[in-house]
Structures are given as structure tokens and as C-alpha cells.
Amino acid sequence: MHKGELTNVNPPRITTEPFNHGWLKTYHTFSFANYYNPRRIHFGALRVLNDDRISPGEGFDMHPHKNMEVVSIPLKGYLKHGDSIENQSIITPGEIQVMSTGKGIYHSEYNGSNEKDLELLQIWIIPNKEETEPEYHNYNILPLMKHNELATFISPNGNTPAHLLQDAWFSMGTLSANHKVSYHLHKPHTGVYFFIIEGNVDIADENLTRRDGIGIWDTESIIIKTNEESQVLAIEVAL
């Protein structure tokens, strides 16, 4: 088993880098925008993992994306989406949105509330096909969620509500305190990045707390042990 980042020799436990833009408070796991760390470029096909907090009524105006799979997971509040292929939607916790940007798409993202902050994770995955037709979908994943399990809601095939143009599996769940769960990797040449949304867990002899992460590869399975009630996101990707 290897743990840590594929491109560095840093300690395995990865913390996020904070940036405050007033209306946007964001925490970057990997190099993004004004944050650059040559040791934190990507974890295999996982290129971006941003933890954003957007003030009421604020957001990102129309801007382009190309040849990237973009997954947005709202944690609190209302995420308002619009794009250049005529999609308009508002999604809330328990739902996700997936954009396959392909040969190009413009989109906007706003806090759909004028009163409360929006908290969301935005994740970019490098696709295994480029210049495809752009697509947008949103999905209700709440029926999949079962207490004390990591439920898989994105995969490369039709076994889950959502899929990506990549060998990528997204799983998430809320686990009770003092609980153990085993995560089994889907393929020999993938790695899994665990992101602790809330709580305190032990993974591969590392203690991880809220918004910490760790990447693991060269193993078939990993045990997650919780020290308190915890919400965990697992992103398994091609290396």
C-alpha cells in the first residue's frame, strides 16, 4: 500500500489551502487559480477538489470549461446552475450535478438563496475522451444513501445514477462513531482519494479530521475507522 500524493514526498495527510475573496471563501486541495504547489497538481485523474462557501446571492458569472468532467456536490444551501446548452436548475444537498464539458460549454453557478450561504464541493476529473459533445445532468442520490455505508453514486458504467468519461467511482456516506467500514478498489491500477467532509477518522494509520484528505493506491482494500460520527467522500480514479 502507498499513501500520500502521487507527485510528492509530503506527509500523507493533506490539508486544504484557504483563500478569501470576500463573497467566496474557498479551500483548494490541488493547485488551482492563484494557488500553485508543484507537489499538489493532481491525484491520477483527480485534478481539482475545491471546498467553496458562497455568500447569499453571489456566484460565478458565465465562464467556459473544456475537456473536463465537473462534479458539484452541494453540502448546504441552494446551487443555481445555468449553461450555454439551455439548462437551468437549482440543486440542494442530496443531489449532484455532473457536466461533461467536452469540446466546450459556458456555465454560471450562483447561490440560489439571498439569505443563507451555499457550501459545495466542486471536483474536476480528467476525461479519457476529449472533444465530445457537452452534457449536463443532475441526479438525486439521496435514495442511495444508507447509514454506515459508503454508497457509490458515480461510476464509469450504468450501475449508478451518474457516470463519467473516465475510470472513476464516487462513494459517500455518514458513519457512526466507532464504526469500521472497508472500501474495496474496483481495478488494479486505480487509487482512491478520501476526503473527510465532517468528523474524525483513521485511515491507513493516519488520523484525519474535517476537510482533510489522503490518497491511497497499490492495495485492494482500505479500512476506515471513525472516532466520531463522520461523513466521508471516496473518489477512486485511474492513475
Positions of PLM-derived features:
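Jelly-roll (double-stranded beta-helix
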Residues: 1-239
